[in-house]
Amino acid sequence: MADKKGSNSEKLLYCSFCGKSQHEVKKLIAGPSVFICDECIDLCNEIIRDEAAGAGLETGLSKSDLPSPQEIRDILDQYVIGQERAKKILAVAVYNHYKRLKHLDKKDDVELSKSNILLIGPTGSGKTLLAQTLARLLNVPFVIADATTLTEAGYVGEDVENIIQKLLQNCNYEVDKAQRGIVYIDEIDKISRKSDNPSITRDVSGEGVQQALLKLVEGTMASVPPQGGRKHPNQDFIQVDTTNILFICGGAFDGLEKVIVDRTEKTGIGFGASVKSKQDRDAGEVLREVEPEDLIKFGLIPELIGRLPVVATLGKLDETALMKILVEPKNALVKQYHKLFNMERVELEIRPAALQAIARKAIRRKTGARGLRSILEQALLDVMYELPAMKGVSKVIIDDNVIDGDGKPLLIYEDAPKVAGSN
């Protein structure tokens, strides 16, 4: 019986679970010879919610069938403009990877090996966006790691196992989910070997990191401190098997096309050899001819290249592609700014000439699609600053002179047009 006699003969009631008295809690609910307080009820609800959220969700693929390569490609088309061959390669590789995971339990003589992916393409060509879209489509845990921040274990910097720690954090430390997630390692080209010859000095952020990543990529038991703490000898670690994690590595690989051209020019000598000069060939066209030996020459170790068998190259985005990126994807920049202005009950019109000017500016800056937002933000800054305090504005028009810095947005009032910043 959850009751006790007090000194003043008052019969006190106590929670049968936590032992708190009726005076220490807001509410005490009675059952057959037991009591439960409001705090314990809240705790029970929280436990049930957490268990329900994770029940049966080993991966995001358990609720529905794995989409076909064509379906994966169609969804990528909604978010990523251009890069058709890269999207096809990724769709097939990801489909095969998760098809393999769904049949892991079946005993067979043939063991399917994992196909990790290497994306090669200039800055702002869509490498990260492709990986993000794939993870969102498949509803699996996803993390982006920057290879330039990684160092060998024991040196100042991030240990490669920190990548798995972040993946665990992104799925609330559910190990089964993390073991079927996607890891995107950016700037992989920046940890290339500094030279072909081994150096006396330790290359802690180059070949050493490649060796450390190799173990992670091919499959190992990574030891991760619980809840993001730092490693020390007297603590228990969470063990995560990386064998079934899909690793996608990406990099710009500046200078790789020269390595490829040097190789192809050496082999292309004599009658019947291609006479197309390297000046006539687009960088993207050259990169499509990449071979493992070119990547080794660039500075990646052969063992790591062997663990990244699927190679997809992305081309530089031209003016037309950048203009499409501004307006066509589901989350296109222009659509986002339309929504922002609609919240102020104002219509935003960005004219085709302005879109062309934005694309030209991004090409000049060599930032690709990544630089589009900063250009548009800069052009709209003044009007977004002034608009909330203005009365009667119904429309804002952006033309190419605004993007080029030679003019200001045109504001259409309910009675007459004005230029932003004018009184």
Curated annotation (Swiss-Prot):
Subunit organization: Component of the ClpX-ClpP complex. Forms a hexameric ring that, in the presence of ATP, binds to fourteen ClpP subunits assembled into a disk-like structure with a central cavity, resembling the structure of eukaryotic proteasomes.
Name of the protein this chain belongs to: ATP-dependent Clp protease ATP-binding subunit ClpX
Biological function: ATP-dependent specificity component of the Clp protease. It directs the protease to specific substrates. Can perform chaperone functions in the absence of ClpP.
Domain ClpX-type ZB: 3-56
PROSITE patterns: CLPX_ZB
Entries under CDD domains matching the protein: RecA-like_ClpX
Organism listed in the record: Paraburkholderia phymatum (strain DSM 17167 / CIP 108236 / LMG 21445 / STM815)
Domain of life: Bacteria
GO biological process, one term: proteolysis involved in protein catabolic process
Cross-referenced InterPro entries: AAA+_ATPase, ATP-dep_Clp_protease_ClpX, ATPase_AAA_core, Clp_ATPase_C, Clp_protease_ATP-bd_su_ClpX, ClpX_bact, P-loop_NTPase, Znf_CppX_C4
Pfam families: AAA_2 (PF07724), ClpB_D2-small (PF10431), zf-C4_ClpX (PF06689)
SUPFAM superfamilies the UniProt entry points to: Glucocorticoid receptor-like (DNA-binding domain), P-loop containing nucleoside triphosphate hydrolases
Binding of Zn(2+), residues: 15, 18, 37, 40
Protein family (similarity comment): Belongs to the ClpX chaperone family.
Keywords, sorted A to Z: ATP-binding, Chaperone, Metal-binding, Nucleotide-binding, Zinc
KW Chaperone (keyword) present: yes
A GO cellular component entry from the record: HslUV protease complex
Binding positions for ATP per the UniProt entry: 122-129
Any GO MF annotation of the entry: unfolded protein binding
